[in-house]
Design a protein with these regions (language model features):
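Conserved NTP phosphate-binding and transfer environment spanning the P-loop NTPase/kinase superfamily
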Residues: 1-122
Length: 122
C-alpha cells in the first residue's frame, strides 16, 4: 500500500543515517552521525536540492547514494569511506545484508520486484 501511494504521488523517499558510522558499535573509530550533517541531509531532501545531486548505487544494499549534499562533506555520504578498513566494512555490510535476507524470508508471496530490490550478499 505504501509503495502504491509513493508511486501514485511521485514521491521521493530518502533513508538518512542518524545512527552509527565509521565502524561497528564499540569500535575505536565508531561515532554517531553528526546532527548538523543529518539536518543538512533532511533539509536538502525537503527543499529539492538532493534531487539535483548525482547518485551512485550501493553494491550491497542497492540504495542510490548521493555523491554530494549541501552542508555535508562527501565522505559522510558513504559508509564505506568512513571506515578505516575497507575489508572490515565489506564483511560487516555482507553480514548485515545476510541478516536482512534471512529475516525477509518470512514474508511469502511478495512480488519479484520487491524481493529483487533487497540487499545482495554474494
Amino acid at each position: 500500500m505504501l509503495g502504491k501511494k509513493i508511486e501514485e504521488h511521485e514521491t521521493n523517499v530518502y533513508l538518512v543515517n542518524t545512527g552509527w558510522a565509521g565502524g561497528r558499535y564499540g569500535m575505536e573509530r565508531c561515532f554517531r552521525m553528526k546532527l548538523p550533517y543529518t539536518r543538512a541531509m533532511v533539509t536538502a531532501a525537503l527543499n529539492g536540492e538532493l534531487e539535483k545531486a548525482e547518485f551512485e548505487k550501493d553494491p550491497v544494499f542497492g540504495l542510490a547514494v548521493p555523491k554530494s549534499c549541501p552542508g555535508v562533506p562527501a565522505e559522510f555520504l558513504s559508509q564505506k569511506a568512513l571506515w578505516q578498513d575497507d575489508k572490515a566494512y565489506e564483511a560487516a555490510a555482507k553480514e548485515l545484508a545476510q541478516s536482512f535476507i534471512k529475516n525477509f524470508k518470512k514474508y511469502t508471496n511478495m512480488p519479484d520486484a520487491i524481493v529483487n530490490a533487497g540487499p545482495k550478499a554474494e
